[in-house]
């Protein structure tokens, strides 16, 4: 797909002035064609791996902030970038730029903060980084590193004015001091349906506990295990025993009478044996 065809595809039914971002990566053209100054709202333009050899067809794009031109065949003519005076981030990595002199026009881009020339022959120049920072006063990051070889930490947020929480004053500490963060338990108030459901759960739990206590008491009694028990369990166990004793009183009296008769019979039999 040619660059012109890709532009038409990305545009669709929109007016050029409505488009703020345009991705034309991997389309094919040696020159920039199809772009006009009608794209006045364009802020991000990407033309990676297109095969560009020249930037001469680049239109005036005053609002453009990010321009991606990596993996092309550009070796010079960077003065065309002055048509976009507000560029902040420029990626020219993996191109054919060999000389530091080719970079001189970039010194006039007063908003340029991040420049990437990785995999370009120019990076082999002695003191390349030092010379580049000296040449472009506004430059903060070169190939992802600052002058002290520290990595670029803010990325696009830095280019957009910084979005860190300290700058905005909306960090965790600020929220805590303002009272915005409170304990969830203080805010939560269950509705009537939820309270009824919770009460049902409590009743079920109480019944389950009573059943467990009765079972434990019965098991301990059957095993003749003595020891401290929970008061509720002991009372229930004594009530059960009293009920059993009351219900079996008549049987106990019968058993006692039977025992006395058995003793008397035994005595009589003993006497007979002695006689």
UniProtKB/Swiss-Prot annotation:
Disulfide bonds: none
InterPro entries the UniProt entry points to: AN32, Leu-rich_rpt, LRR_dom_sf
Biased composition, class Acidic residues, residue ranges: 180-216
Molecular functions (GO terms): histone binding
Organism superkingdom: Eukaryota
Intervals holding LRR repeats: 18-39, 41-62, 63-85, 86-107
One annotated Gene Ontology cellular component of this protein: nucleus
Region (Disordered): 176-275
Basic and acidic residues: compositionally biased ranges: 258-267
UniProtKB keywords: Leucine-rich repeat, Repeat
Pfam families: LRR_9 (PF14580)
Residue ranges of every copy of the LRRCT domain listed in the record: 120-158
Family named by the database record: Belongs to the ANP32 family.
PANTHER family per the UniProt record, alphabetical: ACIDIC LEUCINE-RICH NUCLEAR PHOSPHOPROTEIN 32, ACIDIC LEUCINE-RICH NUCLEAR PHOSPHOPROTEIN 32 FAMILY MEMBER A
Name of the protein this chain belongs to: Acidic leucine-rich nuclear phosphoprotein 32-related protein
Species: Schistosoma mansoni
Lineage: Eukaryota, Metazoa, Spiralia, Lophotrochozoa, Platyhelminthes
